[in-house]
Amino acid sequence: MLFKENPFYLLSVHSTDGAAAIDAALSHQRKLLPREAEGASSEAAHWLLRMENRSEAEYFWPSGLPRRDAFLLAEGGESDCALSPRLRLLRFLNALSEDTLRLEALLSAEEDFLALSPLEALEDIQKDRRIAGFPAFKEPWVIEGYQQALILEIGSGAIAASRRLPEEERRRLLIALAKQGRRGMLYTQLLSAYERDVEKERAQLENDIAYALMISQKHPQQGRSLLAEKSRRYLSLSMPLYAMSGCWVLRPVFSSIRNRAIELSERLGRETGKRWFSLLEELFAFVPVFAKEIREDQVRLSCGEKLPRGKEGISQKDRLEIPRHISEIPHVKLEKGDRRWGIVVVIVLALAFLLFGR
């Protein structure tokens, strides 16, 4: 429940106001508002005068603060009073609908989650009830339910705010949170939402990469060019997941490219292998484990040693889906390692002409 949806705010009353003040506020609004708008004010008054409903409004209101500071906070201002974790989280929740996510605010919210206390909220509510003349709150266990609702609302609001960020900024924010080591409830919700949002594109890119590896068997240059393009996008999308979980997120793609590099170096020669391992290094050098493997492979390749293949990374389907959005494979000039196949073709054609052309 946001401040501006709260019955206290709708009636312009505070949690220290009694039944008479609530009735007076309702009468005042009825004089000012058109008849069709009276329903919301009447419902707000009914909510505050029924004790079983009132407690929720009290929890999501700056109860415990003086009237001036409470309304200042509700309007988005800064109170001079020291705020409890609950009130700081309420302020954070209300800012999410208008503000962009900031790293400092998220880190503070994670700390406030840990310090959130049902007893502190209960004390604020009971104090204001005594001033208002309402009976004491007799079911303190209900506060824990409101606390969970607050956490869920903040999670939903933060996810919505993260989706409004530019794509690159959203990824940077998640990576920064992971590097801070603050992997609490809020961070987990944000990362899970991001993973769901990019799941479809990552799956498509994995298929594109498998397609590029497939065509590289007959067209190494074109396959490598397409592979570089699709892998860069895949790695960009995967960086927040890598920051959280480590290299295993990228291992399938890395292993598939490495195995193809080994296969092509054995079939087409060392120069082709060097170019493929150079691409592998360009893509994955930021991962220490992969960088070490690539360096070791490059040394073995230079020495003419046989390179051990790893497990196949990307799961092979019975029938590879040919991407519809790839209209043609990239056109590239033949490099040194591929020219010999052209020479072989010319020689074969010449022999055929000599044998059968006469």
Each model region followed by its residue ranges:
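N-terminal J-domain/J-like co-chaperone modules of DnaJ/Hsp40 proteins
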Residues: M1-E36, A40, A44-W47, N53-S55, ...
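Amphipathic alpha-helical protein-interaction segments
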Residues: I22-D23, A40, A44, G64-E335
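Alpha-helical transmembrane anchor segments and their immediate juxtamembrane flanks
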Residues: E335-R358
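Intrinsically disordered, low-complexity regions enriched in small/polar residues
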Residues: L10, A136, Q148, L355-R358
